[in-house]
Amino acid sequence: MRFDWSKLGRTPPAGLVVARNLAHHAAQWPTRAARANLKAVPDDSHSAYVWEASHAALMTQGLPAKGGEIRVGIRVPRLEMIITRGDNVLDAYQLHGKTDAQAGAWLDVKLRVLGLKPAGDVRLPYDLPEHPMGGRPHELAMLGRELGELARWFGGSADVLEEFTAKLAGPRASPILCWPHHFDIATLVNLEEGPNARSIGVGASPGDEYYAQPYVYVNPWPRFDAGKLPDLPTPGHWHTEGFFGAVATGDDILAMKDRGGGLLAFVSGAFDIARARLGA
């Protein structure tokens, strides 16, 4: 693994809620840019991000700009919107001291200069909780540690998912993407063809209404009988309310001696259990 798991834990997992909510909202501007300028696909993956470790950023797919393809993203440790071409950062906008509306206006100007459609005209097909700042400027001076830790959770999760998909035998996993609605980074393994195909989602959330901390999940479909659940590898447990899956929380992961190796073993073991139970 490339990620250094010993660097995680500087901030308790449950202490990332504010940073996560701010980053989640900030990341809606890049996805709006993608929706405005890319052809829609049925699974909505045109609107999703990839984790770019070199920038510690969630980045869109390439957008067809004048002069060459560009990407838009959020550099998580700084909560900074960036526009890149290749490996180069063309422009950046630090959100500290600025409102969400100002960030969107900045992006729209840059997109127009590049011959692209503005992000501000896009209406998202889902709702998010109210922006933590309302219409006030972002105050990030006291959130540097939390934003850095949030970025490390994304980086570590992406690394484990890459290791998992690289070693997966049999069915092919989908690309590893971060989804703008729920803000989770995940891959989907379809075990068969068809609209009601058996499948297993493997991913990581930075936290949500179910867990106020990052967690990793393995979600089989269709769900199992909750009364007859098999034992999971350490440190997992079954989550059955709201969604169904095997879960390892951030606290559980940090308590492991070998965090990266242990988490990969949990994900792989839970996947094998789910696949066997689904009969695939």
Predicted regions and their residues:
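TerminUS-proximal long segments
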Residues: 1, 241-280
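N-terminal ordered "arm"
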Residues: 2-69
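Short glycine-rich, low-complexity/disordered patches
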Residues: 35-44, 116-127, 166-183, 276-280
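Long, hydrophobic/aromatic-enriched structural stretches that serve as scaffold segments
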Residues: 48-127
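Intrinsically disordered, low-complexity regulatory segments enriched in Ser/Thr/Pro
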Residues: 63-94, 206-254
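Short loop/turn segments that flank or connect secondary-structure elements
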Residues: 112-113, 118-120, 140-144, 151, ...
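Surface-exposed beta-loop interaction hotspot
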Residues: 118-171
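Secondary-shell segments that build the walls of catalytic and ion/ligand-binding clefts
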Residues: 154-230
